[in-house]
Amino acid sequence: SIAAVALAAAGVLSARSVMQAPAPGEGEKKLIDLKSDLMGPVAPGDSVVFLVGNFAAQHNGAVITCDSAVRYSDMRIEFFGNVLINKNTTYIYGDRAEYDGDVNEARVYSDIIKVVDGDATLYTYKFLFNTKSNVGEFDDGGVMLNRENLLESVRGYYYADTKELIAVDRVEMRNDEYELKGDSVVYDMTTDNAFFFEHTNIWNKDGDYLYADRGAYDKLDTLYI
């Protein structure tokens, strides 16, 4: 199960500098900071506001830029065109995004969404990212490329702080040393080590085959434990 896997796994700089908001008091919810060249109501007397031109938003330390945006309320915004969400080393690229500041979640949409973190790049179609926990997820198929490694799965959970990807459901992972197929894998993006769970088939470059329900691949020593 996902819970078991999780337990086992144990150009934006200017926008960021412009929007330094004071820290909220204890128990106070931090609002979304916004800036743009132009803004105005979508319709006369409407509280919904359209923003365009050098737009940027900031919340929980994440900076979001795009071509234009619509603010529906103080905590709910929709972004259009060349959307970029950046927090620390994570960069998320898409065509459109919806952000709900009450739950700290950005839902990103595009024909192909790209999530870049150092050498690792994740490609998917829909991506949910929490700007407070720094955890993202996809459930419609995703592919991660990291140096010589390729990892595919139907669902996945990206942990920006620990540099891990939990891949779930029809997982395939391969590089020059081995190919792995299984139900779930925890992949360390820094070390390239992988922890696998349940119904895992592994073939190495020499043609050797291994089946396991639980184990680990150590990149440094090329060991299957």
Predicted regions and their residues:
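N-terminal amphipathic/hydrophobic interface segments
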Residues: L13-I225
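Bacterial N-terminal signal peptides
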Residues: S1-G11
